Amino acid sequence: MTDDATRTLGKGSIPPGPVPEGIIRLYSMRFCPYAHRTRLVLRAKGIRHEVININLRNKPEWYFTKHPFGQIPVLENSKCQLIYESVIACEYLDDAYPGRKLYPYDPYERARQKMLLELFYKVPHLTKECLVALRCGRDCADLKLALRQEFCNLEEGSHTKILECF
């Protein structure tokens, strides 16, 4: 199944049945960058999967059995094993499924990738805050400055020039 055939479940919905053998289920949300990270890995590795979107403003009661805080993304396999948190889910997919490796084999390079991801964590939130401020006609100069600083941190950490794009 592909992302095109998704359904969104909310409060009062019936939980989906068991995950079929040979497929992994992704509990997601259409506009969540963390869930999209997991979707990208599923596609890049060619992993057969189904997507069930969760209404995060009106979460189904049963969903808290999938994630203790009701967050997304969550992976579920046919053995009822659950994996959540996007970075952990992506690493699991890369390790558990054969084919093209997305993470380096070298422990140092793998650690560097994780450190770079840590530096990136503030960027999506600041970007969203800035866009909301602009949409509402509020001044976002301080948010732009903070976002620029995060890009500087990323640039320092990655030893690449990314500010030229911003």
Q: Predicted segment positions?
A:
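GST-like domain detector, emphasizing the conserved glutathione-binding G-site
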Residues: 1-164
